[in-house]
Regions:
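Polybasic, low-complexity RNA-engagement segments
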Residues: 1-152
Length: 152
């Protein structure tokens, strides 16, 4: 698993700095690797010649021809390190999003990825397009969050 190339690292870090307001100095302390069009943050680079089905670390982003998509998991871990592009939802809005619905979002953020937040907790990645918010959160995590909402 190769370390992330300098141009790719610059592009991934630019997403988190420019879109989400994460401090570039923090991102510079992380070790980044790329495998199968995925960008991972790891505590140590794997030894040369060692391959794993999955890298030991956190998947931070996916590389698509259309651009870079941050993962819900990494946004959750960044939490309060993000200062921009956050959609603070209430419980009924969160339920709608988790059920796969889009909701009206008049907040004025530019189209693109946002961190979905309920109170102080970042719950995952959202997409804002033409004043509508959706949540491409993984199915397992959606079910987990819906279950928690029903229990409260």
């Amino acid at each position: 698993m190769p370390a992330l190339s300098d141009p790719a690292r610059a592009a991934v870090c630019a997403l988190f700095v420019d879109r989400f307001g994460v401090d570039a100095r923090f991102l510079a302390t992380l070790r980044w690797i790329e495998t199968n069009q995925e960008v991972w943050v790891v505590s140590e680079l794997p030894p040369a010649g060692v391959t794993h089905v999955r890298p030991p670390g956190i998947r931070a982003a996916r590389l698509h021809p259309s651009g870079i998509k941050p993962t819900s998991h990494f946004l959750t871990l960044l939490g309060n390190r993000m200062t921009r592009s956050q959609a603070a939802v209430n419980r009924p809005q969160l339920r709608q999003l988790l059920l796969g619905q889009r909701i009206a979002w008049p907040d004025g953020d530019a189209d693109g990825f946002v961190a979905i937040r309920l109170a102080d907790d970042v719950l995952g990645c959202g997409v804002l397009r033409r004043g509508r918010l959706s949540a491409p959160i993984p199915t397992g995590r959606r079910r987990e969050l819906l279950s928690i909402l029903e229990d409260v």
